[in-house]
Amino acid sequence: MAKKKAFIPFFYFTSIVFLPWLISLCCNKSLKTWITTWWNTRQCETFLNDIQEKSVLEKFIQLEDLFQLDEMIKEYPETDLQQFRLGIHKETIQFIKIHNEYRIHTILHFSTNLISFVILSGYSFWGKEKLFILNSWVQEFLYNLSDTIKAFSILLLTDLCIGFHSPHGWELMIGYIYKDFGFAHYEQILSGLVSTFPVILDTIFKYWIFRYLNRISPSLVVIYHAIND
């Protein structure tokens, strides 16, 4: 009976780990058709206007200067000119389809992550008792560790999060989150987040050492500073 009670929180923790993946798989299959139909029927006209006025024009302006393109067209025979215009038309349609699929992909991933967050929040709320048991296990495990191992673990964690090489890890993590939500890659936003998060975490960590660790385990703070130096 005791083993069964101990197994329930472990099963609950395992379900929390794998539940987001299962929700994402089910939502992607069930929502993709509905979102695609809704986007193509309700948003098609607005989307095409946006693409024609911005993305398509910007792409072709970058590919070929308008003046050089005009001079090249004047030298073309009528048959080649028709083929040239047909090629531009096909490329424009293909470009619009790609951006249309990208918008659908963005909405699908954002909706899936939002649904996953709501379900996990409710799942965690109704399983507060099991989370309390898991928390007590973690606290007991940490309490049984020696101060040296605790200090080494804290130092390793802080070096990973706010150390010299941490911006590369933050860049990969934030980039993955952007991709998971279906957002485009913006270098300025990414650089701002990468340069801000480690500073905020460093400040919080120093405050935590000053207010919490100094009070409950002064020896741990001494060992940590000795290893860090």
Curated annotation (Swiss-Prot):
InterPro entries, per the entry: CemA
Protein name: Potassium/proton antiporter CemA
GO terms of biological process kind: potassium ion transport
Spans through the membrane: 6-26, 107-127, 189-209
HAMAP family referenced in this protein's UniProt entry, alphabetically: CemA_PxcA (MF_01308)
Location (main, coarse): plastid
Gene assigned in the entry: cemA
Keywords: Antiport, Chloroplast, Hydrogen ion transport, Ion transport, Membrane, Plastid, Plastid inner membrane, Potassium, Potassium transport, Transmembrane, Transmembrane helix, Transport
Bilayer disposition of the protein: Multi-pass membrane protein
PANTHER family, alphabetized: CHLOROPLAST ENVELOPE MEMBRANE PROTEIN (PTHR33650:SF2), CHLOROPLAST ENVELOPE MEMBRANE PROTEIN-RELATED (PTHR33650)
An example Gene Ontology molecular-function term: proton transmembrane transporter activity
Keyword presence, Signal: no
Family: Belongs to the CemA family.
Reactions catalysed: K(+)(in) + H(+)(out) = K(+)(out) + H(+)(in)
Annotated compartments: Plastid, Chloroplast inner membrane
One Gene Ontology cellular component annotation held by this UniProt entry: chloroplast inner membrane
Function field: Contributes to K(+)/H(+) antiport activity by supporting proton efflux to control proton extrusion and homeostasis in chloroplasts in a light-dependent manner to modulate photosynthesis. Prevents excessive induction of non-photochemical quenching (NPQ) under continuous-light conditions. Indirectly promotes efficient inorganic carbon uptake into chloroplasts.
